[in-house]
Amino acid sequence: MKVLWAALLVTFLAGCQAKVEQPVEPETEPELRQQAEGQSGQPWELALGRFWDYLRWVQTLSEQVQEELLSPQVTQELTTLMDETMKELKAYKSELEEQLSPVAEETRARLSKELQAAQARLGADMEDVRSRLVQYRSEVQAMLGQSTEELRARLASHLRKLRKRLLRDADDLQKRLAVYQAGAREGAERGVSAIRERLGPLVEQGRVRAATVGSLASQPLQERAQALGERLRARMEEMGSRTRDRLDEVKEQVAEVRAKLEEQAQQISLQAEAFQARLKSWFEPLVEDMQRQWAGLVEKVQAAVGASTAPVPSDNH
């Protein structure tokens, strides 16, 4: 059974290794739409794609965009998309950090620091986009009724530059994540190798036991059953003999205990009778003396009562 569990564990670890070894394809497309379609499907990349799609729509500077730029709706939408992107990115980073546990502490700290810096640059770029749009909205509101062509051209230029920065930082972040995941894969491979080394002797023992069982299986089934029956019969006879001997010992012990109890009961009865006789000899004289004193006291009381009730002689005679 232990060998079976060991084999299952090795199979499970091999599956985990295969899962870790999935390649990460770097992004090479320069355009926003191509970048969104070429992503590997990570949640943070999908969230960043939605941010880019929204930025692409803002860059059109259509009439609807111009109307919504005069309200805080665009900045609110961008803030929501930014928060969603950073949240998904942090979750993915935490997942990779768990996979990096077998890696050396120094390597893990360096990779984490580089990834955190790339993450901060991407967040700063998205915040810069939002700030530019807020500034543009304030300037448009201040120039209501005037020509805003120059302002729109300046905003379009800023957004194009910010778009390039976003693409560059996102590509850098993906490369950092690829390095991060490669470190996780390396640590997982080392962990699996160590486990395989520890499980090697167990697997060999299981192989030897399996060979032994196979040699036993070559014996005729009837001979093995007969030998097993004889062993069981001998074992049952031995257990029966021990049980009978033990029962005889218990009977003897019970008889001894009963005799001792009867003897002790007889001794207690004799001691009680002797004690009762002593008590009687102690208290009988005392009781007789108290009876005599009580009788004398009664006679005295009666005499005193009789004397007090006698008639007194009259002086007139």
Swiss-Prot record:
A Pfam family it matches: Apolipoprotein
Modification after translation, per record: APOE exists as multiple glycosylated and sialylated glycoforms within cells and in plasma. The extent of glycosylation and sialylation are tissue and context specific.
Signal peptide (from-to): 1-18
Region Homooligomerization: start-end pairs: 266-317
Entry keywords, A to Z: Chylomicron, Endosome, Extracellular matrix, Glycoprotein, HDL, Heparin-binding, Lipid transport, Lipid-binding, Oxidation, Phosphoprotein, Repeat, Secreted, Signal, Transport, VLDL
Annotated GO biological process: AMPA glutamate receptor clustering; amyloid precursor protein metabolic process; artery morphogenesis; cellular response to lipoprotein particle stimulus; cholesterol catabolic process; cholesterol efflux; cholesterol homeostasis; chylomicron remnant clearance
InterPro entries: ApoA_E, Apolipoprotein_A1/A4/E
Broad class of where this protein is predominantly found: secreted
Residues glycosylated per entry: T212
Binding locations of heparin: L162, R163, K164, R165, G229, E230, R231, L232, R233, A234, R235, M236
Phosphoserine modifications at: S147
Residue spans of the Sequence repeats: 80-101, 102-123, 124-145, 146-167, 168-189, 190-211, 212-233, 234-255
Methionine sulfoxide modifications at: M143
Single annotated GO MF: metal chelating activity
Subcellular location: Secreted; Secreted, Extracellular space; Secreted, Extracellular space, Extracellular matrix; Extracellular vesicle
GO cellular component: chylomicron remnant; endoplasmic reticulum; extracellular exosome; extracellular matrix; extracellular space; glutamatergic synapse; Golgi apparatus; high-density lipoprotein particle
Similarity comment: Belongs to the apolipoprotein A1/A4/E family.
Subunit record text: Homotetramer. May interact with ABCA1; functionally associated with ABCA1 in the biogenesis of HDLs. May interact with APP/A4 amyloid-beta peptide; the interaction is extremely stable in vitro but its physiological significance is unclear. May interact with MAPT. May interact with MAP2. In the cerebrospinal fluid, interacts with secreted SORL1. Interacts with PMEL; this allows the loading of PMEL luminal fragment on ILVs to induce fibril nucleation.
PANTHER family in the cross-refs: APOLIPOPROTEIN, APOLIPOPROTEIN E
Record's protein name: Apolipoprotein E
Organism: Macaca nemestrina
GN (gene name): APOE
